A protein has these predicted regions:
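Non-catalytic nucleic-acid-binding/docking modules located in mid-to-C-terminal regions
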Residues: 2-6, 24-36, 71, 208-332
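Noncatalytic, basic helical substrate-engagement surface that gates or grips nucleic-acid strands
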Residues: 3, 7, 12-17, 21, ...
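A polyampholytic, Gly/Pro-enriched intrinsically disordered region
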Residues: 182-190, 206-209, 222-225
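Acidic, metal-binding active-site segment of PIN/NYN-like and related structure-specific nucleases
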Residues: 172-200
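Short, hinge-like loop/turn segments at secondary-structure boundaries
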Residues: 93-96, 180-182, 201-204
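Short acidic loop-to-helix transition motifs that present clustered carboxylates
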Residues: 166-171
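Conserved NTP-donor binding/palm subdomain of two-metal-ion nucleotidyltransferases/polymerases, i.e.
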Residues: 191-194, 198-199, 204-212, 216
Length: 332
């Protein structure tokens, strides 16, 4: 059987697994005013891609920043740097997928523009428009100009930002785990593999809410250590092992068998046990452990991060208004 090539962000089906196996003590909806006087870090690129896809980058970034500050939440926006070389193959595949989506979108647009839409049923027309919208989101690109616009807006608000050397997720996890921030706002499921203590997902600008994931509580309810959880997720397929022929459901089934093993084998690790008792692991154990190591924050040695104090600077309301007016935002 050919290995499945994984190109989606984060661990596939992890969110479903957590929701099915954890209680509201670990995963619950909260209003943002519950975070008053707390600091948060934001994995910025996720929201930039989303807001660009909605043709509302500056408007929604303005609303997000305003929402946090109006609830007395002190944010730090973390920007991605250069991806690690271990992701080169994945990034090539994603670029190809973007091109395919763009070609298909352009073909559909051309077809839609020449057909008589009155001959389509309401359902057919809706389905075609939905597919084009979905395709357009698949080839969204963030430009350097987009990044500079957002940074200028952050400066105008007096909000701090940090340029990561590599990707933002490990920096966000480090800042939360070290106690410099209370939680991370991100929809990337990799945050749990890093052991980020608290993650805020599905932030809603409309309902001023988010879903709070408490990682220590999650691990407690799953009866797993952070190390075991990370090993399970890495074996199930990450951005660093895209050719693996494994998945989360099967890995969990094998882990359940491992925990029910003969108690005389207490010193054997999960990977070692799998290697001896199955053909589920097809790669070298050392390679898997090296990937696990990539999902730790111990390699972060930036003195600026060690001494960082997340706080607000004075805001420039006239600059905020100028920037937003230039972006077409109408103040009421």
């Amino acid at each position: 059987m050919q290995p499945t090539i994984k190109t989606t962000m984060g661990i596939k089906n992890l969110n479903r697994f957590l929701k099915e196996n954890c209680t509201k003590k670990s995963i619950r909806k909260i209003q943002l005013n519950h975070l008053t006087n707390k600091t948060v870090v934001i994995d910025t690129s996720i929201y930039m891609y989303r807001y660009i896809a909605e043709n509302a980058l500056m408007e929604n970034m303005y609303l997000l920043i305003s929402l946090l500050l109006s609830n007395n939440i002190v944010p730090l926006f973390v920007f991605d740097g250069k991806p690690p070389i271990e992701k080169n193959e994945l990034l090539k595949l994603r670029r190809l997928e973007k091109k395919r989506a763009e070609y298909k979108y352009n073909d559909m647009i051309a077809e839609y523009n020449i057909i008589d839409t009155s001959t389509l049923s309401a359902d057919e027309n809706h389905k075609m428009l939905q597919e084009m919208s979905s395709l357009k989101k698949q080839f969204v690109r963030v430009t350097e100009n987009d990044i500079q616009q957002v940074k200028t807006l952050l400066n105008a608000y007096g909000v701090m930002y940090y340029d990561s050397i590599h990707e933002a997720d490990d920096v966000c996890a480090y800042l939360v785990k070290s106690g410099k921030a209370w939680a991370c706002i991100s929809d990337d499921m990799d945050m749990f593999v890093y052991g980020c203590t608290r993650v805020l997902r599905n932030i809603s600008l409309l309902h001023t809410s988010a879903i709070l994931y408490d990682t220590p509580c999650i691990l407690n309810e799953l009866c797993m250590t952070e190390r075991i959880f990370r090993e399970i997720m890495v074996l199930s397929g990450t951005d660093y092992n895209i050719h693996c022929n494994t998945n989360l459901d099967m890995t969990i089934k094998w882990y359940t068998k491992y925990t029910a093993r003969d108690v005389s084998l207490t010193n054997i690790t999960f990977y070692e046990w799998l290697h001896r008792n199955s053909d589920y692991i097809t790669t070298d154990i050392r390679e898997l452990l090296d990937i696990c190591d990539l999902f730790t924050t111990k390699h972060i040695q930036d003195k600026c991060l060690e001494n960082i104090e997340i706080k607000l600077a004075p805001r420039n309301d006239s600059l905020i208004r100028e920037l937003m007016t230039e972006s077409g935002f109408v103040f009421t």
